[in-house]
Amino acid sequence: MARGQNHAATELVHVGFGNFLAMNKVLAIVTPGSAPIQRMIREGKKKGIIIDITSGRRTKAAVFTETGNIMLVAITPEAVAGRVNTRSARLARTAGDKTS
């Protein structure tokens, strides 16, 4: 493995329609309503860095990744955060059960 890489398991979060996000590669999850974010999405489409995983639904969040891509998802940033927190709490509880 390359120097400086994280050996921990990648946390995948379901974002609908059979799609998942690798949370260790996510920089920010934002709502697409503001003018600056809409501008970034428009420019991203021109550059070819947009990954649309909405399956034709309305975009409710834009996910910025370490690789410079912008992923468009059909669930809200709050829903993504809730899924991360729910899964993390479940994993912590399971790990606590194993140490007892």
Protein language model regions, located:
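Hydrophobic alpha-helical segments that drive targeting, anchoring, or assembly
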Residues: 24-25, 43, 47, 69
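Short aromatic-glycine motifs in intrinsically disordered, low-complexity regions
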Residues: 9-20
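Plant-biased recognition of short, low-complexity, intrinsically disordered N-terminal tails
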Residues: 1-9
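C-terminal structural segments of small proteins and small subunits
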Residues: 62-99
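Compact, glycine-rich, soluble single-domain proteins
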Residues: 36-52
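Phosphoinositide-dependent membrane-docking surfaces
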Residues: 23-31
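Short, structured protein-protein interaction patches enriched in aromatics and acidic/basic residues
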Residues: 52-66
